[in-house]
Amino acid sequence: MDAFKLLTRSTKFKTGPSSSSASLPSTGKAENPQLFRNSEAEKLLEEQKNGKKRKRGSAADEPEEREPNLDFFSSNKGSSKKVVKAEEAPSDEERGSGSEDEDEMDEVQRRTILNSHKIKVTDMRELEEIQPVQAQGEEEPKKKKKKRKQKEEPAQTLTKKEQKKARRLFPRPLVSFKELRTQYKISRRLAENITEQGFTVPTEVQLGTLPLLLGDRTIGQSKTEEPVEPDLLVVAPTGSGKTLSFLIPVINKIVRHHHGQQEERGIFAVVVAPTKELASQIVNEGRKLVSGTGVKITLMKKGMQVVEREDDDEDVLDEGSSESSESEDDEKTTEKKSKGKAPVTKSDILVTTPLQLVNALSANKTKPMATLPLVRNIVLDEADVLLDPLFREQTLDIWRACTHPELRASLWSATMGSSIEDLAKSTIKERKDASSLTKSYPLYRLVVGLKDSAIPNIQHKLVYAATEQGKLLGLRQLLHPAAAAASDIRLRPPFLIFTQTIPRAVALHSELRYDIPPEAGGSSRIAVLHSDLSDGQRSEIMKNFRKGEIWILVTTDLLARGIDFRGINGVVNYDIPNSAAVYVHRVGRTGRAGREGGVAVTYYTKEDIPYVKSIANVIDVSEKLRGTEGEKSVQKWLLDSLPDLSKKDKKELKKHGVRARQTNLKSVADDKQQRKTRISTKSGFERRMENKKKGAIAASRNRKLQGPSGAEPDSGDDGWGGIQE
């Protein structure tokens, strides 16, 4: 008998921390939204927040300044006086001008903070354009004419390492959102709106991009010149605050323009997003920021007029005169004109999908593309999709329609291949060559973390299910977890389930809709969302999912990009993604803004084995970035055994998905394969009986419809025609 147990039998001990108390994305906002940080960088940032300036060349004096705070053996009176003096100093410095604050952080400090947060800023221009800028910034003594030839040679003889070093930039990072007002002089009302939204600590992408877009002087040609807004390519993890990063500079720029030129009004910025859901989300976030600033942000809708055409009036009048009779008066003609032509949108920022704006500018492709001469900023959110073959022509048409000579472009995504970067560079260069401006605008690229990698704050699980029935069984085990080992992953609602095609999403939804008991809400807790639904249905499902009325949402890649569900606990890839980039975006729906505890489960079958390696590599890199200890989700033997995919197969997979799950298969062999991948637990006999029943009902309905029509020829004139008088 255990004596301790006997003596403490009346005492209730608290059990260890249960899984319910574990940190989950749905439990609330993370204390620190930053993904990458260390103690040294946090110490430097804290010094900047508290106003403690580190003077150059005075490192020896620094311990003496900190002595009062470290003197633990002094008397109470003396120490209190010294502490008060130390606390009063920052308040005096905070009252100083912004020009003094610019000298606070030297290049070593900037480099330390940026490197610790894994922020890499690169100048994407040619070396011939970069080196003259660097030469002007340096104050050098007079040189002889003989050495001028030697200046041109290093541009060709530089090694790759030296070229990378020449391109690296270390701008001043944003310490806190308060600096937007004190350091960069943004609109007072805009700064208040940011504070009201609860933004205090900037994420990595905000820490790096906001100073660049708001006029950072630390990397310019000289501090006396006006800062130049660059063109920007940004690759940052999902959920890191990219929307806020591009909205704040655009709104501030428009506010300044309105103060300077009140009479000029029109569309000054265009934000392009690949889906309606993402465009609507950007507008909702933008409306919170523009409140009280006088800036208007609008979502592009069907039939909306964005430009005024001279030939539109003539067309409407011609239509009205041809349709109306001679007796109609002029009032009806004017009514037709007002009905036929919508008023031009009075908005400063237009958020749109590519096709909607192209149709508006080209009158549904019946007229030449109109121009947007006032647009000074074009933002491509999820730029890798917008410049993919599916949207490329539409996006480039919008880009070309923005004809203002000082147009600045910024491209944002969590994944951006080298081909997309090259296309962006070539487009910007074409515009520069076509314009008559001699002024050169820099092109920078900012990368946070490892490029094209998944966020490190979520747990990945790659599960082999062998067959379609195995995947369905594994998914039901997630919905109804039984007693399991501590190492097993538990996924709690709300979560998303991704499928390859719309028919598969519908089939999976119909299979799972009764898996949640009626006591918990039943079938109303599971919904399906895809592009075949109407706009009203899609917005209603999104609203209910955000409100928490829907717990499980089955969808396609429609929701894989940009949508911010902050309380999502996990993602289930029921069908493997078409590429590693799609995987990064899918799993990025959880773990938003630094939230811990998100789970990403990916099921794969025998048919998926040739395509899994790219996903396994992304998971492996993410776990290395996280620095997890213990058992990994992807073992080394699995990485070594999975086959590599050829470029042709990768292209085919990206375009059509796994062949066995395609809906347009017609051959006998493909039909057999499709039967294997059917999402259903019904046996073949049950399906045959259901089909027979459906066929009998359809035949009976047809006989009823054909009965009266078939009797007419027989009855004809032989029937009784009534009493004739």
Swiss-Prot record:
Provide the protein's localization. Answer: Nucleus, Nucleolus
Q: Where does this chain carry the motif Q motif?
A: 179-207
Q: Where is the Helicase C-terminal domain?
A: 474-642
> Would the keyword RNA-binding turn up in this protein's UniProt record?
yes
Which family is it part of? Belongs to the DEAD box helicase family. DDX52/ROK1 subfamily.
Q: What Pfam family is a match, any one?
A: Helicase_C
List the GO molecular function terms. ATP binding; ATP hydrolysis activity; RNA binding; RNA helicase activity
Q: What is its EC number?
A: 3.6.4.13
Q: Where is the composition biased (Basic and acidic residues)?
A: 39-50, 84-98, 684-693
- UniProt lists compositionally biased (Low complexity) regions at 14-30
- CC annotations in GO: cytosol; nucleolus
Q: Which GO terms describe its biological process?
A: maturation of SSU-rRNA
Q: What class of enzyme is it?
A: hydrolase
Q: Which PROSITE patterns match?
A: HELICASE_ATP_BIND_1, HELICASE_CTER, Q_MOTIF
Q: Where is the Helicase ATP-binding domain?
A: 223-434
- Motif stretch (DEAD box): 381-384
Comp. bias intervals (Acidic residues): 309-332
Q: Where is this region: Disordered?
A: 1-165, 307-344, 649-725
Keyword Nucleus included in the entry's annotation? yes
Q: Per its record, how is this protein called by name?
A: ATP-dependent RNA helicase rok1
